[in-house]
């Protein structure tokens, strides 16, 4: 089965946009960051978007290339590592 390049492109863009928004928040001091509920909400939302996009990519690749999907989120990236689709150091970070 072939990978859905539109899905992959969309999810990668979601991750890139989220990381970019989160990186901009690094300019804030810790106190300023923690004092602003809207900023905290934005950070939480962008983290969730990036995590969901990464998992969607993982499950898509698992289904199409490995012909199976893991029962647990944590196992998804390990399956791709074991199949030599992603490097071990990336698996550890994810």
Task: List each language-model region with its residue ranges.
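Solvent-exposed interaction patches of small proteins and small membrane subunits
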Residues: 1-94
């Amino acid at each position: 089965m072939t990978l859905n390049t539109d899905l992959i492109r969309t999810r990668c863009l979601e991750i890139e946009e989220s990381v970019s928004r989160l990186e901009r928040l690094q300019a804030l001091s810790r106190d300023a960051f923690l004092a602003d509920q809207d900023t905290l909400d934005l950070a939480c939302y962008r983290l969730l978007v990036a995590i969901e996009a990464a998992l969607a990519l993982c499950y898509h690749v698992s289904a199409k290339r490995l012909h199976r999907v893991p029962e647990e989120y944590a196992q998804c990236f390990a399956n791709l590592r074991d199949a030599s689709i992603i490097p071990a150091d990336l698996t550890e970070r994810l």
